[in-house]
């Protein structure tokens, strides 16, 4: 049996993994659970790991795997994602849940449109191209997808590196804390964490060397959210 906070954290991690394939950062977990410090997150993670609900993947930053779900929990609260939605500024539309797709055969390959480069640093223009990228269908869920090549290092703490291919599910809505492709002022595209703050849109990097970027809601259009990553080793 888990405590309320342990159950909330486990649910939050599972939801983020299902949505983006990437574990949430300790900062995101701290904010989602309304904790005062990251040490509280560390204690919850350790407790879940000791009880066999999650495990940390070796040699990978921010890599958590959910092993099982609890049968019951103490003081079960509303899922964190619901609390986030309740606190979301209405300047941008809320997330619409996408249907779950049936698992694709492991040997199926889909040719995704490769729309040039996207910045993981200062925004750069998203280049259109007729190129495609072969992607295992098992990496993709429901919906329409496209690929962008990552340029820059501002998302390295999220495990996204220069030269990676971002696999993006087309959508114009997203929750706070999700990694999105944001079109800024109709000209530049960037890959960042999305947050809404005091009537503004904040695009957060995952690199302490970069500062958050603030824009008016009408200056930012969500064009997709991160569904996965593809990395080539040469």
Swiss-Prot record:
What would you give as a GO molecular function for this chain, any one? Answer: serine-type endopeptidase activity
Chain residues forming the annotated DNA-binding region:
26-46
Which reaction does this chain catalyze? Hydrolysis of Ala-|-Gly bond in repressor LexA
The active site lies at 154, 192
Keywords from the UniProt entry:
Autocatalytic cleavage, DNA damage, DNA repair, DNA replication, DNA-binding, Hydrolase, Repressor, SOS response, Transcription, Transcription regulation
Regions of compositional bias (Low complexity) in chain numbering: 91-100
Q: Where is this site: Cleavage?
A: 120-121
Enumerate the Gene Ontology biological process terms. Answer: DNA repair; DNA replication; negative regulation of DNA-templated transcription; proteolysis; SOS response
| Superkingdom | Bacteria
Question: What are its E.C. numbers?
Answer: 3.4.21.88
SUPFAM superfamilies in the record = LexA/Signal peptidase, Winged helix' DNA-binding domain
Region of interest: Disordered: 73-100
- Work out whether the entry's keyword set contains ATP-binding: no
Q: What does this protein do?
A: Represses a number of genes involved in the response to DNA damage (SOS response), including recA and lexA. In the presence of single-stranded DNA, RecA interacts with LexA causing an autocatalytic cleavage which disrupts the DNA-binding part of LexA, leading to derepression of the SOS regulon and eventually DNA repair.
UniProt xrefs under PANTHER family? LEXA REPRESSOR (PTHR33516), LEXA REPRESSOR-RELATED (PTHR33516:SF2)
- Subunit structure of this chain's protein: Homodimer.
Family assignment from sequence similarity: Belongs to the peptidase S24 family.
Q: What is this protein called?
A: LexA repressor
Question: What is the species listed in this Swiss-Prot or TrEMBL entry?
Answer: Novosphingobium aromaticivorans (strain ATCC 700278 / DSM 12444 / CCUG 56034 / CIP 105152 / NBRC 16084 / F199)
Q: What is the lineage of its organism?
A: Bacteria, Pseudomonadati, Pseudomonadota, Alphaproteobacteria, Sphingomonadales
